[in-house]
Amino acid sequence: MEDKTQINIDRLIDLGSFEVTGAEKRQFEGELADFLEYARVINGAPLHLPPASHAVDKEQLLRADEAAPWKEREALIGNAPALQGTSYLVPPLAGSSGTGKEQEPRTVKPGSGDYEAVIGLEVHAQLNTSTKLFCPCPTSFGSDPNSNTCPVCSGQPGALPVLNREAVSMAIKAGLAMGCTINERSLFARKNYFYPDLPKGYQISQFEEPICSGGFVEIELDKTKRKIRLNRIHMEEDAGKLVHVGAPGIWGSKASAVDYNRSSVPLIEIVSEPDISNPAEAREFMVMLRAILVTLGICNGNMEEGNLRCDANVSLRERGDTELGVKVEIKNMNSLKAIERALAYEITRLEQMKRAGTPIEQETRLWDDSSQKTALMRSKEESHDYRYFPDPDLLPLHVTGEWIESVRAALPPMPLERKNRYEREFSFNESEARLFMVNPGYAAFFEKCLEHYGNARNLANWLFSELLSHEDDFDRLHVTPEDFAKFLMKIDSGEISGRQGKDILRRAFADKVALHEILGREDHAQITDRASIEKAVDTVIAAHPGQVAEYRSGKTRVLGYLVGAVMKATGGKANPGLVNEVLTEKLKG
C-alpha cells in the first residue's frame, strides 16, 4: 500500500511557487519528515496533498493567512489535514479524521482551560407606550402592515419629531430600578446608516449624553450573587421590519417587503459592561433584566414578538490577562435558550481559532437556530462609522429633580425583594420563590388571589401544579384571581372535591369559559351523604368481583382502583375520604 505520508517535496514547493536553495530544500525535507511523523502519530490518519491540478496562488494564500476566516483559508488548500502549528488550518478535534473540514465545536464548558470569555450584552427593550417615540402613531403589535404610520415615522421630508414624555418617564423608571445615575441633561443624536427598514436614512438615538449612566443588575447563580455593571441606558427609536417571502430569512427568499409599523416605536437600550464570564451568567442576566422590566410595567418582555432583543459581544483572552481580546458580535438570538447556546458555540469557535493561531477579526455574526451555529453577517462597525451628530430637530432633554423623584416614589418592589419576602413570609423554598421572582405575572396573580384567599401554601400548590399546566402566560389567562380564590374556597369547604376542581379547571381552559360560569351553571355539590355513598360502593363491589377477591386475599393496593371506580360512578362528586372509609369497611365485612 502506498504510504501517503511520503510527499514529493518538489511538488510541494511547486504548489506554493516558493523559491528555495538546495540547502534550504534539504533542511526543509528533514524538518518536514519529522513533522509528518509527528502528525501521523497525533492524527492517526494518512496525510496527503490535494491533486496536482489544485493550484494554490502563493500571494492569495499569504493574504488569506493574514486576514481571511479560517474556513476560507482551508478552501484555498483543499483537503489538507488539520495539523497543530499551522495558522491557516483548523486543529483536529478529539476523534476527528484529520481532514481539516469544518467540524462541530467540542462540548466543553465555555471559557475553561487556558482562555476565559469576556461577554457584554446590549439589550433593546420595547417600551409599553401607547404611541411612538416621536409621533402619535399607535404602537400596537399585529396590525396590518404599514397601517400605523405617518409622515414622521415614515421619514417624509419636512416632518418634525416631538418627544413622547411617557417614554422618558419609563426610561427614568428603568434607570432608577437598576441603580443608574439619571442625567438631568441628555441629547438625541442621529445614527447614520442605510438599510431598507430605516426610512429616514438615520436612526434617532443617544450617543455621548445618554439619559442614564452606570447602574447594575444583580444576578444569583449557584447560590452566589453578583452585580453585573451597566455602562448606560439610552433611548432610541426602533427601525421597521423586513418580511421575507419564500424563506424564514433573507437568504433564499424570493423577495423582501418592509413593514414600517415598528418604525419609531420607543426603545431603551441597556448596555452592560463586559462583566459576564460565561453563557449561564448571560442567560441569568437576561432573566433578571426581563423580570425587572416586566415588574416595572414598562416592557412586555416577549422575546418572540421582539419586545426584548439581545445582542452579545464576546471575546477571549488568556486566563488572568487584563487586556480585552478582539470582540465578535452575535445577533438574532430570540430566546433565552438561544442566547446561552449561541454564546457557548461562539466561545468554543473562538477558542479553536486561538489554539490554531488564527487571527480573530471584529465582525458581526448571526445565530441560526436550525443549524445551532453562528454565521458571518458583516464586518463589525465602529461608532465612527455611524457618523453620530446631535439631531438638529430635537432640543437637549432636561429632566428635573422633581420629575425623577415622582418616578422614584411609584417604583414597585423589585424581583429580588419579592423573592426574599416570599421565603420569609410564606416559607417558600428557594425554587418556589424564584418562580415568582422571575415571572412577575405569576406574582401579580398570586398577590391578587391573596386579597381574597389567605392560604398561601395551598394557593401556590394549585397555582404551580394545576393552573400553570394549562397556561403559563398570565397575560393570556382568562381565569381571574377573584374567581380562582372563590374556587379554592369551595374546595376547602368541601363543597367540591379536589378531583372535581381539577376537572372544572380543565374544562374552563378547554372551552375558554370563566370559572364562575361553570360553577354557577352546574351542580358541583360534593356528595357527603353516607347512604348515597354506600349505595355507590355496593354497586362497584358487585361489578368487580375479581378485584374484591384480590383485596381480600391480601393485595390491598387494589383499593385505589375501587375508590376510582366509585368516584367515576358518582361523577367525581363523592367525598374521597368517605368513599375510602366505606369501601374499607365493606371489603372487610
Predicted features along the sequence, with ranges:
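Core structural elements
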Residues: G306-E318, Y386, E423-E447, A456-D472, ...
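M16/insulysin-pitrilysin zinc metalloprotease superfamily fold
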Residues: E19, H452-Y453, L459, E466-H478, ...
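C-terminal non-catalytic interaction appendages of large macromolecular assemblies
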Residues: Y260-V265, M303-C310, R319-T322, A525-G589
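Basic, nucleic-acid-interacting segments
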Residues: T99-P413, R424, E451
